[in-house]
Curated annotation (Swiss-Prot):
Belongs to the protein kinase superfamily. Tyr protein kinase family. HCMV ganciclovir subfamily. This is Probable ganciclovir kinase. ATP binds at L85, G86, S87, G88, S89, F90, G91, S92, V93, K103. The keyword Protein biosynthesis does not apply. The active site is at D195 (proton acceptor).
Amino acid sequence: MASPHPRKKRIVQKLPSLTQSCNGELRPCPECLQPHFSKIPILSQLITEHKFMCVSEISAHKVVFKLPKSWFQCEHLKPQEDAVLGSGSFGSVKPISKVTCAKYFTDPVDFYHELIACNLAALAQIRNSTRAIYLVRMTGAYIPCKCILFPRYAGSLYDFKCWDKISAKKLAKEFKSLVNAVNFLNDEVGIIHSDISTSNILVAHGPDFPGTFLLADLGVASLHSGNHQTELCVKNSRGKILYNMSCTRDIFLLCKDPVKPAQVIFRCYLLACKLINSETLHQTFIVGKILAQNIDMASLFYTMLECVEKMLDTKDIKPSREFYNKIGPDDESHKAYFLQFLVPRVVLLEMLSRLWDTKLSIGIDSFGNTTEKNVLEVQDKILFASWCTHLKGFLHKGGLQLNLNKLRAQPLYELVRFFLKFDYFSLSGRQ
């Protein structure tokens, strides 16, 4: 019997969808992606990469990108006029279809900054797709209307309401996956996210609600010192400079205040007390690779603790928000302003310490005692202790301590211990 014609035996290998995985979640499926990218011909990979920015010039310290022609033609569907999925200082996010949304920017500087960061991440995702599945990937960009396309998800943890459906094991599983996303950005992309928070962690659709958690929004991401080049530039086809990305950062402006690392808050406090040289420490600089990882891991940890509070807060009294609104100072010139953001994490860690019969500490307790000797001035130590007492009162009022047993899960305990390695209330973090 003659063998079948080879063309009839050929299997056409399609690019796995980046918006619909085989289990129904709006994310790349590792089972689908890994075989694809391990077998894809190099020519096909180059064609895929051609849809993104490519390097046109390289110097000792600078890389110049040129933009693909496809980005100058708006071929995407028009968004629904009145539908807005989210908004901020950058602009707004609008739905394009059931599986795609567009992030529109009002300022071209913000647009090109995020576009560069997303471009670097997208190219790294092609090279190592498995490690990147918990990071939201751009699927297109259009210069004329200043928008970047992304897969559409169910919403963010900031707006999430169904905390009764989240178990301690589920929370630990999802945040352990987000650790992979942070490591991917640090190791493979060479950037610090620097804006991890509940508003930038999205929840995917899936057969089991809630779905997978994914890290999003590279709007303020920047290079760390693990890169050979520390400056980036975007030019159009005529050589006109569209954007220069400064890779220097002010460490005091990294992360949202409620999840700012304790070691950063330590420096902010010393600076306010004039115990360190502001001219030295307040200068902008390129964040080191290890410091970048510590900062992102710490902010991810404190974001998880915010989720722990939400899981315990069955009466929805929002104790930490109540504390910030009624007790904590809102004037950044207040010497102890940044200390208030230590209060929720210190109190929650003491609650978890009692639950698990262990000591969980970031170098300061609810009485204002610090591992570093003579850090807080006497009046600030008394003030900090009173703040912790106020928050404990809010927690008791909401009965959060009565729900602690739902956190009895070994994976969550192990993850908390893991996160504690990355931050401490001292000048150099945990040694």
